[in-house]
């Protein structure tokens, strides 16, 4: 990742996530924290659970564990002490979930703490406590314009805060076209030289891998092997489902970044069937690696992919299977999509662009706080 220019005034920035497990938004916070630190700011992740401690430490980010896994008076007081006059003494706190809004709102009652809500869920929070706490939010960051408009339509109270659309970014120097890495991955996994499909993400119900398996089963036999990168509660049921359908599905678990780059470059096509995806980092990584993408055209995916991928009707395995069959048979189209994919990722979804956009708004908010203080 290239160096990014320094800030005018160093800020103390907390990244608050009460998530129990490492999620895509956790990874974004880690990358963002490192990027903002590179601009001269002091960044600290504030978490509730050990998996998050290890995850942020693996990204060389300072971490503080607090009892913020639930909306409780104990957790709120601990957070207020840490972010207010405690060792963190933050100027700005970026929050990940509705619970984090509530906790940060309490922490900001006696200090000019700036709260920034980075929403990454398909639907906005609408419970009464969060609506009241939202009065303390200075800015909401949306991943796509589609997500912003849906949130405003379903939760009009969110219009109280300023907002900005900032797509997530990936390291386009790491995630890049690499034929040698792709060949090596195929060799290690015994995938041969034929077509290979790739899906990346947690093996959880919201990802709708069942739709993907049903879609692949519509391809004229023999269907290409499908590699699934990720872990989760549904692995057993997905294995059974694949066996019933007679599909060759390789469950390879969660891969480190270098191995994941190989997986993307080994893929003939990267496939994604979640119908309400907000913003898939896996699709951005695939674009950065110059891979043809076929995805369900729901949620924020059409805005994310644009003309650099193929969109299928959401929730329709028959249509998805037909489009997949056509794409596998059309080498020229795949080659054109690969070029468009890489170009779109570099132009729109680099880490450098994401950090610059966040730095612009966070530094402006921090300067305003300093003047008020």
In which residue ranges do the predicted regions lie?
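Conserved donor-binding/catalytic core segment of Leloir-type glycosyltransferases
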Residues: 14, 191-207, 213-216
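Nucleotide-activated donor-binding/catalytic signature segment of Leloir-type glycosyltransferases, i.e.
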Residues: 239-255
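Conserved acidic donor-binding segment of nucleotide-sugar-dependent glycosyltransferases
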Residues: 307-318, 326-331
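Short alpha-helical donor nucleotide-sugar binding micro-motif in glycosyltransferases
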Residues: 254-255, 262-267
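Short His-centered aromatic/hydrophobic patch
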Residues: 95-101, 119
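Short hydrophobic beta-strand element within catalytic cores of glycosyltransferases
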Residues: 46, 292-295
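Aromatic "clamp/platform" in nucleotide-sugar-dependent glycosyltransferases that forms part
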Residues: 275
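Carbohydrate-associated surface elements
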Residues: 146, 169
């Amino acid at each position: 990742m290239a160096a990014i220019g320094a800030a005018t005034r160093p800020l103390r920035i907390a990244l608050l996530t009460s998530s129990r497990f490492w999620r895509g938004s956790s990874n974004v916070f880690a990358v963002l924290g490192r990027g903002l630190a590179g601009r001269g700011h002091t960044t600290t992740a504030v978490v509730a659970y050990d998996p998050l401690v290890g995850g942020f430490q693996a990204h060389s980010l300072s971490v503080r564990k607090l009892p913020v896994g639930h909306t409780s008076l104990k957790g709120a007081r601990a957070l207020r002490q840490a972010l207010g006059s405690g060792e963190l003494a933050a100027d700005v706190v970026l929050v990940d979930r509705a619970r984090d809004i509530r906790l940060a709102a309490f922490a900001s009652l006696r200090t000019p703490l700036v709260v920034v809500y980075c929403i990454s869920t398909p639907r906005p929070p609408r419970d009464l406590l969060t609506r009241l706490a939202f009065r303390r939010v200075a800015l909401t960051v949306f991943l796509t314009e589609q997500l912003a408009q849906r949130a405003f339509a379903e939760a009009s109270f969110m219009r109280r805060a300023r907002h900005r659309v900032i797509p997530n970014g990936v390291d386009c120097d790491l995630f890049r076209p690499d034929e040698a890495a792709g060949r090596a991955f195929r060799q290690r996994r015994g995938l041969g030289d034929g077509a290979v499909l790739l899906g990346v993400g947690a093996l959880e119900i919201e990802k709708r891998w069942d739709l993907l398996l049903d879609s692949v089963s519509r391809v004229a036999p023999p269907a290409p092997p499908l590699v699934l990168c990720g872990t989760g509660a549904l692995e057993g049921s997905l294995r059974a489902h694949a066996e019933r359908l007679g599909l060759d599905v390789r469950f390879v678990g969660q891969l480190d970044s270098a191995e994941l780059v190989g997986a993307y470059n080994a893929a003939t096509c990267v496939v994604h069937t979640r119908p309400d995806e907000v913003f898939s980092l896996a699709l951005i990584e695939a674009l950065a690696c110059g891979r043809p993408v076929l995805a369900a055209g729901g949620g924020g995916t059409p805005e994310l992919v644009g003309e650099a991928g193929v969109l299928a009707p959401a929730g329709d395995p028959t249509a998805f299977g037909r489009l997949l069959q056509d794409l596998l048979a059309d080498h020229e189209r795949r080659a054109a999509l690969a070029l468009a994919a890489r170009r779109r990722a570099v132009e729109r979804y680099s880490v450098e662009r994401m950090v610059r956009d966040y730095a612009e708004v966070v530094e402006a908010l921090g300067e305003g706080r300093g003047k008020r203080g």
